[in-house]
């Protein structure tokens, strides 16, 4: 049986192109590149990214971006899951997210990962592995994307 890897994240997973606000072709996005590297015989990589997705915080302009509200359903549709690749948190620091700060985002990520475990979506007899990819460090010189800046 194929191993299933679910990539749950934000614009980096979705394939957002910062300069043009368009989307990379699916063959260029990193989940597809991971699938190519692993091959198609033994692995299935599920791409579940959304531009602007937050951890547990509501965006007042688009409440559908709250990752916690959709994560359980998304993960259930992909079960069983061997590896969850999780990358959220960067969008928690947008100016329209009042609760966004490092401590609250870290707690939100912890809560989401604990919730993912409690859903019981592991393959029988195996425990789902979780790969946490942390958000980039946001400093004054990183507030805007530069040419060839890949994050």
What is the meaning of each model-derived region?
Residues 33, 40-41, 65-151:
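Alpha-helical cap/lid subdomain in secreted, periplasmic
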Residues 1-50, 56-59, 73-76, 84:
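Serine-esterase "nucleophile elbow" of acetyl-processing enzymes
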Residues 12-14, 50-55, 90-94, 137-139:
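Solvent-exposed loop/turn segments at secondary-structure junctions
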């Amino acid at each position: 049986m194929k191993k299933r890897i679910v990539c749950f994240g934000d614009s980096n997973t979705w394939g957002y192109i910062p300069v043009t606000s368009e989307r990379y072709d699916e063959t260029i996005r990193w989940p597809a590149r991971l699938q190519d590297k692993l091959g198609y015989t033994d692995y299935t990589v599920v791409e579940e990214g959304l531009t602007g997705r937050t951890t547990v915080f509501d965006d007042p302009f688009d409440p559908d971006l709250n990752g916690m509200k959709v994560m359980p359903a998304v993960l259930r549709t992909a079960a069983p899951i061997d590896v969850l690749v999780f990358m959220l948190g960067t969008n928690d620091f947008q100016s329209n997210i009042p609760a966004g700060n490092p401590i609250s985002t870290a707690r939100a990520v912890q809560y989401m990962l604990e919730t993912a475990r409690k859903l019981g979506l592991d393959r029988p007899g195996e425990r789902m592995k979780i790969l946490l990819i942390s958000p980039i460090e946001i400093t004054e010189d990183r507030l805007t994307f530069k040419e060839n800046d890949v994050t």
